[in-house]
Regions:
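Non-catalytic alpha-helical scaffolds and adjoining flexible linkers that form interface surfaces
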Residues: 1-241
Length: 241
């Protein structure tokens, strides 16, 4: 079997035998299972690069049922996540979501890019963790094919007097049309602008905006409800201990 060189990030790790690990890694070309022989030995050259959240470059060879890691070079450890329980909790939540929505043999370059940018924001900045999570969820939905209508009312197509977001109809509603959609959520102009920015911004700049605490509550509500509805699962940030 040939050697494969790829960049990837560790989504999960489990112990195997006395010193080995079984890993799930997200690469630009999908999710793969990897065995890391001897990675738990104290002096193993694989130890640093086979931990949860680590982004690295890996040399792999394909076995009968999984890939095996020959060598690895770490690119980013996201160390602050490991020393802050709140950061760890949110990073674990984001990682679970990514694990759920990705599969083998698919183009996951843009999802990997979003995942790395999100972990960087959690790890290296002091931005509100709920803000980071809301931006991540809304942008991820766009990558999964659930881009909301954020230019005009989903019903009458007007761009004027947008006052609500409709989970049912996947986008904005004007004041008049919102009256026939009891589930539509009222949003401010600032929240509307924030959502438009998240959907349309350059991938490297999606977190580069300010929002008030009141409007962040609206953004959190909309992104969480919309996310859970489209993925047909209720995601919550869980306590780790």
């Amino acid at each position: 079997m040939g050697i494969i060189k790829t960049k990837g990030i560790i989504l999960s790790e489990s112990n195997m035998n006395d010193f080995d690990k079984m890993l799930t890694m997200l690469t630009p070309n999908g999710k793969i299972g990897c065995a890391a022989k001897g990675a738990r030995k104290p002096k193993s050259l694989l130890m640093a690069g086979t931990q949860l959240f680590v982004f690295g470059e890996y040399m792999l060879y394909q076995g009968t049922s999984s890939y095996h890691i020959n060598s690895c070079d770490t690119i980013e450890l996201f160390y602050p996540i490991r020393t802050d329980l709140d950061k760890l909790k949110y990073a674990a939540h984001v990682t679970k979501v990514i694990n759920d929505v990705t599969d083998e043999n698919q183009n996951t370059y843009r999802i990997l890019q979003l995942f790395l940018n999100t972990l960087y924001m959690i790890s290296e900045t002091d931005k509100d963790l709920d803000f980071i999570l809301s931006v991540f969820k809304l942008r991820l939905l766009c990558l999964l094919g659930f881009t909301p209508q954020i230019k005009a009312c989903t019903n009458c197509k007007t761009g004027e007097n947008i006052t609500h977001f409709s989970i049912r109809d996947n986008g904005f509603k004007c004041e008049a049309c919102s009256k026939i959609d009891k589930g539509a959520i009222r949003i401010s102009d600032s929240t509307k602008t924030a959502m438009q920015y998240i959907v349309l911004a350059d991938p490297k700049k999606i977190f580069s905006f300010q929002i008030s605490e009141e409007n962040l509550q609206e953004l959190n509500l909309v992104s969480n409800l919309y996310f859970n509805e489209k993925l047909e699962k209720e995601y919550k940030v869980e306590n780790l201990f």
